[in-house]
């Protein structure tokens, strides 16, 4: 499926912006999936550090040993599969499945109680905004910050992926789109947007309906629909925390060059029934069996032990997955409580009997979506073309059985990847909403599942602005009833499904004098502009005061309107959003933790490299051949180094200077390499004959360097002669030509390398002159050869770059000559044309004079005058007289 989408994307891919990438995130309660799209990575799934396709939703926060309780450097965050195992050992530090708590307060007993049961041991507190925070090791973490940490870690991996694709790329994630349930209210939506706003690098965030994400993916994958025939599908999405049934119509116009239209038609949901509920049911079965087997353990005692409950929940989750494919699951929990190991089994039949009361609830959202369609839609269940399965829990056998009973087996569509359809769809919608790239066009009609209303402070009646089923994004203006007086301030309350969530205070006092009853004889009204954004946030964009006055003109009356825009402020009711200062503080805190995590990871990685190198070095030293024939001084030095550094490793802590570790890695590596090279050279004679050969090679290389210098000098001298008319100073132009950065960097140490090479040649000459050869000097001779080989290799590489660079610069001089030569030619030709034009103009003037003279002669002859060449106008007049 993903290959099909990638093909569609590639064929339509056109970058609108640059250096940007879109990250689509399917933010689930239990798992998170992400896809990044950029010019370097069309539809690339962001894998976890363990190369898995989905990420555990949550993280663990621990305090490192050796740090004070208030030391900000002592915090370690763990993500990925390791978090699952930490939940049973450190339940009070493991923060999982946070999605249902977004935009909630501790007053929401149903949500909070259910979460506490699923995640025992965590301490929840209320913030000053009435939202939920977790207290971990006496540090308070607002829910938005925890979600942002999770998202930031994924965005960082996406950026690393782009860098791995092309090290030269400057693409980075700056836009993000999230899946979100349609039943999420204003507070929940704002909380998710706030979480995204405190991440680093994310400039724009978009919220996309989970159902619409799957529908978009389905259309792009299906590709072909009967032209002119409207089809109806239901996306049945059963995830970990909820069930959603989204009804859509899909229409391919008869003109198949026109885009497909996807329209949201109906919705049903259950916010608490999902995979997590089934996990808790299996956990209850395990708990009951344990208490029956161990009557000495009381229920209260078991429930007071967070680790025991976490182990039961973990075993229940594994059993649920096994029962999806098998009829029985074995349970094995070590040291459940009081060092008691517990073993039992759960059958699928036991599980299905236990949840029998929930069976009707499984399909109720589908019935609700059909019976509560928006507007005038009236599609019946038998007319549905198919039910598209999404969400991991839709694979549970009892769930599929209920769906088949409701709509028949052939209408249950399994050709969509239940795990990844939403993330594929949300990234495509994110691309469209952000206008980042051009893709296959789709007409998407999204509708609100809630009704949005307002109430003025002096009235009791609610006025609907956007009713259930209204398409969005949408904007509308409403003119209020006329009033005779203007208060200093008045309020507008905003409601979602009749529940107050925000109060707008309008400052009208500033215009009271301008809108008095004398000036507005017909009264004053307010024109309020409401907006339902693409994120389905309901807000007021503008409030205008309208003055209505009556002017008598004869027997008729003309109404004259004039308006002023009023300032207003907004305040969340009950649950409040993060303030700008809180956003800034949390953003900086996450940046600090990211920096510390990166440094800690690099530190630990370097420690591991050092430890590995030390053990490799020790193994080398224990080799019989090295012990007998190795370079004794270097073997002794490395042996002592290994012993000292291994002892040093025992005491290394995060306070250790990272440079010390890198320095030790380098020292071990250099010495180990020398010994290995020495052993590899065991068959080399290292005698005078070999050194004479080395000396000859060295002189040849120095001669090659000198020859190249002379060649360049000859060319420059030749150019000075040949290009004297076009280039004033050839040598100066040659020096001015810049070489590539990598060449300049490599040649910055040319003189140093050349000097070291000459010194090694001098050392060879000294040994040859004194005939210092023999087994007792073998180590020293090898060291000389090693130095010679190293500097020769470096010098040869640098000479190659010099030759290439000089050749390029000489070619540039030739090009400069040609450019200047052509420029001179153009100037000469231009001057020549100018001279020719002037000459031509002069010739024309001469010819004109001759013609005029001939005319004069004719006139004179006709007048019978003898003067053939009058010298002045005065003479001509005189003759005429």
From Swiss-Prot:
Gene Ontology CC entries for this record: endoplasmic reticulum; endoplasmic reticulum chaperone complex; endoplasmic reticulum lumen
Motif stretch (Prevents secretion from ER): 878-881
GO molecular function, one term: ATP binding
GO biological process: post-translational protein targeting to membrane, translocation; response to unfolded protein
Ranges of compositional bias, category Acidic residues: 872-881
Induction description: By the unfolded protein response (UPR).
Biased composition (Basic and acidic residues): 833-844
Localization (cell): Endoplasmic reticulum lumen
Post-translational modification: N-glycosylated.
Residues that carry a glycan: 128, 458, 474, 481, 489, 527, 844
Database matches in InterPro entries: ATPase_NBD (IPR043129), Heat_shock_70_CS (IPR018181), HSP70_C_sf (IPR029048), Hsp_70_fam (IPR013126)
Highest taxon of the lineage: Eukaryota
Catalytic activity: ATP + H2O = ADP + phosphate + H(+)
Signal peptide extent: 1-20
PROSITE patterns: ER_TARGET, HSP70_2, HSP70_3
Annotated segments matching region Disordered: 833-881
Other notes: Present with 137 molecules/cell in log phase SD medium.
Subunit structure: Interacts with the heat shock protein 70 (HSP70) KAR2, and this stimulates nucleotide exchange on KAR2. KAR2 in turn acts to stimulate the ATPase activity of LHS1.
Family assignment from sequence similarity: Belongs to the heat shock protein 70 family.
Protein name: Heat shock protein 70 homolog LHS1
């Amino acid at each position: 499926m993903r290959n099909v989408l990638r093909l569609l994307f590639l064929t339509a891919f056109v970058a609108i912006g640059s250096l940007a990438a879109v990250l689509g995130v399917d933010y689930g309660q239990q798992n998170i999936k992400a896809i990044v799209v950029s010019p370097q990575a069309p539809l690339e799934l962001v894998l976890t550090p363990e190369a898995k396709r989905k990420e555990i939703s949550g993280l663990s926060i621990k305090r490192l040993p050796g740090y004070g309780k208030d030391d900000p450097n002592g915090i370690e965050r763990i993500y990925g599969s390791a978090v699952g195992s930490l939940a049973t050992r450190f339940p009070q530090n493991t923060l999982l499945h946070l999605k249902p708590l977004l935009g909630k307060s501790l007053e929401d007993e149903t949500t909070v109680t259910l979460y506490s049961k699923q995640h025992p041991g965590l301490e929840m507190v209320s913030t000053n905004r009435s939202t939920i925070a977790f207290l971990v090791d006496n540090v308070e973490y607002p829910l938005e910050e925890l979600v942002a940490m999770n998202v930031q870690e994924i965005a960082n991996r996406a950026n690393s992926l782009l860098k791995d694709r092309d090290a030269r790329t400057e693409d980075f994630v700056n836009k993000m789109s999230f899946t979100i349930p349609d039943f999420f209210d204003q507070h929940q939506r704002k909380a998710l947007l706030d979480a995204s706003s405190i991440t680093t690098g994310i400039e724009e965030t978009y919220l996309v309906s989970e159902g619409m994400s799957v529908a978009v993916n389905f259309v792009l994958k299906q590709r072909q629909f009967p032209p002119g025939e409207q089809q109806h599908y239901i996306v049945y999405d059963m995830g970990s925390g909820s069930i959603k049934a989204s009804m859509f119509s899909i229409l391919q116009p008869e003109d198949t060059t026109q885009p497909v239209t996807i329209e949201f038609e109906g919705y049903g949901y259950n916010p608490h029934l999902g995979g997590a509920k089934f996990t808790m049911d299996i956990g209850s079965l395990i708990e009951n069996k344990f208490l029956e087997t161990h009557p000495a353990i009381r229920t209260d005692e078991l429930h007071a032990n967070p680790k025991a409950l976490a182990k039961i929940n973990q075993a229940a989750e594994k059993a649920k997955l096994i029962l999806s494919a098998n009829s029985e699951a074995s349970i094995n929990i070590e040291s459940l409580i009081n060092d008691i190991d517990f073993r039992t089994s759960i059958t699928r039949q036991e599980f299905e009997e236990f949840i029998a009361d929930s069976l009707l609830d499984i399909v109720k959202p589908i019935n609700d979506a059909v019976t509560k369609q928006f507007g005038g839609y009236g599609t019946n269940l038998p007319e549905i073309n198919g039910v598209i399965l999404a969400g991991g829990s839709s694979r549970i056998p009892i769930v599929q059985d209920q769906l088949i009973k409701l709509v028949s087996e052939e209408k249950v569509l399994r050709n969509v990847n239940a795990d990844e359809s939403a993330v594929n769809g949300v990234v495509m919608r994110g691309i469209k909403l952000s206008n980042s790239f051009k893709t296959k066009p789709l007409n998407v009609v999204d509708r609100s599942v809630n009704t949005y209303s307002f109430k003025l402070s002096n009235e009791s009646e609610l006025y609907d602005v956007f009713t259930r089923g209204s398409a969005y994004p949408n904007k509308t203006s409403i003119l209020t009833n006329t009033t005779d007086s203007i208060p200093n301030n008045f309020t507008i309350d905003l409601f979602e499904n009749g529940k107050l969530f925000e109060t707008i205070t309008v400052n009208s006092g500033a215009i009271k004098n301008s809108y008095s009853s004398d000036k507005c004889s017909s009264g004053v009204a307010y024109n309020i502009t409401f907006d339902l954004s693409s994120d389905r946030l309901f807000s007021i964009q503008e409030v205008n005061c309208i003055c209505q006055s009556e002017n008598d003109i004869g027997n008729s009356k003309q109404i004259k309107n004039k308006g002023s825009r009023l300032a207003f402020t907004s305040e969340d009711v009950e649950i409040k959003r993060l303030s700008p200062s809180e956003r800034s503080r949390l953003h900086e805190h996450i940046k600090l933790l990211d920096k510390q995590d990166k440094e800690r990871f690099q530190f630990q990685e370097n420690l591991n490299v050092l430890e590995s190198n030390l053990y490799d070095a020790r193994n080398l030293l224990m080799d019989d051949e090295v012990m007998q024939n190795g370079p004794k001084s270097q073997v002794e030095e490395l042996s002592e180094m290994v012993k000292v550094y291994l002892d040093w490793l025992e005491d290394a802590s995060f306070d250790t200077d990272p440079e010390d570790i890198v320095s030790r890695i380098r020292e071990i590596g250099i010495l180990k390499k020398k010994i290995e090279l020495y052993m590899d050279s065991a068959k080399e004679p290292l005698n005078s004959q070999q050194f004479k050969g080395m000396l000859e090679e060295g002189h040849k290389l120095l001669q090659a360097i000198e020859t190249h210098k002379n060649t360049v000098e000859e060319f420059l001298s030749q150019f000075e002669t040949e290009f004297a008319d076009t280039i004033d100073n050839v040598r100066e132009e040659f020096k001015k030509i810049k070489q590539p950065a990598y060449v300049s960097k490599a040649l910055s140490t040319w003189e140093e390398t050349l000097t070291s090479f000459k010194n090694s040649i001098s050392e060879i000459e000294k040994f040859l002159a004194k005939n210092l050869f023999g087994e007792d000097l073998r180590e020293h001779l090898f060291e000389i050869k090693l130095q010679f080989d190293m500097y020769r290799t470096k010098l040869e590489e640098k000479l190659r770059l010099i030759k290439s660079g000089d050749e390029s610069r000489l070619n540039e001089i030739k090009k400069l000559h040609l450019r200047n030569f052509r420029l001179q030619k153009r100037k000469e030709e231009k001057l020549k044309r100018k001279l020719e034009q002037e000459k031509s103009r002069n010739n024309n003037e001469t010819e004109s004079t001759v013609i005029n003279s001939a005319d004069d002669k004719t006139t004179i002859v006709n007048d019978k005058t003898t003067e053939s060449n009058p010298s002045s106008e005065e003479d001509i007049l005189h003759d005429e007289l």
